[in-house]
Swiss-Prot record:
One of its GO terms (molecular function) is proteasome binding. InterPro entries: Ubiquitin-like_Pup. Residues 23-61 are annotated as: ARC ATPase binding. Residues 1-36 are annotated as: Disordered. GO terms for biological process: modification-dependent protein catabolic process; proteasomal protein catabolic process; protein pupylation. This is Prokaryotic ubiquitin-like protein Pup. Strongly interacts with the proteasome-associated ATPase ARC through a hydrophobic interface; the interacting region of Pup lies in its C-terminal half. There is one Pup binding site per ARC hexamer ring. There is a cross-link at residue 67 (Isoglutamyl lysine isopeptide (Glu-Lys) (interchain with K-? in acceptor proteins)). Belongs to the prokaryotic ubiquitin-like protein family.
Amino acid sequence: MPQQFEQPQAQQAATQEDDALATTQAAAQTESADQADVLDDILDDIESTLETNAEEYVNSFVQKGGE
């Protein structure tokens, strides 16, 4: 008879672990999506800068003289 009560507890623990894993995965996916959005914004900014004045952008990285 005690075995009958242990099985639902084990199932409940497994369900709680599954719920915790699902929550963690959802949070990780949300964070990844946010990071991808930030990266896209940075790349868009670089692209627009290059479209408007690529030469000035590149020259800002070129060393001059003894720099």
